[in-house]
Amino acid sequence: MQGAQHHSSDEGHIFSEEAGLVGGPLVVLIHGSLDRSAGMLRLSRQLHDVARVLRYDRRGYAKSWPHPGPFSVAHQVEDLRGLLAGRDAVLIGHSYGGNVALAAAQSLGQQITGVTTYETPLSWFDWWPGTTAGAIGVASDVDDAAEAFMVRLIGLERWNALPERTKTERRREGEALVGELSSLRQSAPWEASLISTRVLCGYGNRGSAHHADGARWLNSNLSDSSLVCIDGAGHNAHMTHSAEFARLLVQPHLEV
């Protein structure tokens, strides 16, 4: 499989793209809420010499829009199952994408040879704060959810400076955003005791305290895990610290 792909199912299409070392170990990059596969490109390029890298737009985002849903983690695991087509893979999940990776590890078992999570939200817990970008997005109407999420994440000034085309694209993804985050707040999409895959639990020391707490919780409750901090990084470490992200949170999976 090479280049851009469109995987179709009864529920809708999923856009994906593969690059890197042909025949190398497969690494799948799973983006977070209101993001897209293009946001994982810098990290992907760090890995092209050592792995085959698959990036994809999760249902309802970017080139996988429009999509009728549902947008739960369980449905997204089925999208991932289709993209893997039986191949073994290492899964790298940024933010919400970490929940997809963990749920896939539980569902697909030995087919998943390693998992990395980075500042993955555990928003079904009572201790998870209700003032996060995700919480604000869920509390908004679908038409306004994406804008509210982005303003909370990057600030009003940066949002207003975005091109109108970009803002329009983000706003139309509000349905996917509300659908996936609402589902996540209702119940855990995986059980730590049922995940045996090695997991690297990442966070940045310039990120929010609750994201660090979430990474520590994962490390404490998964059976085979390590806690990894990227020095100087915030929530978007895959973009701002892509080399460190690859070295600390991806390459260890390829060395075993």
Annotated model-derived regions:
Residues 230-246:
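Catalytic histidine-centered segment of alpha/beta-hydrolase-like enzymes
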Residues 10-66:
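Conserved HGGG/HGGXW glycine-rich cap/lid loop of the alpha/beta-hydrolase fold
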Residues 1-13:
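N-terminal cap/lid segment of alpha/beta-hydrolase-fold proteins
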Residues 166-221, 226-229:
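Conserved serine/cysteine hydrolase catalytic core
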Residues 102-106, 110-140:
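Flexible "cap/lid" loop of the alpha/beta hydrolase fold
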Residues 39-41, 64-69, 127-128, 212-213:
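Conserved catalytic-core motifs of eukaryotic protein kinase domains, centered on the activation segment
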Residues 29-32, 95, 204:
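Glycine-rich His-Gly loop
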Residues 42-45, 54-92, 96, 247:
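Active-site loop/oxyanion-hole signature of alpha/beta-hydrolase fold enzymes
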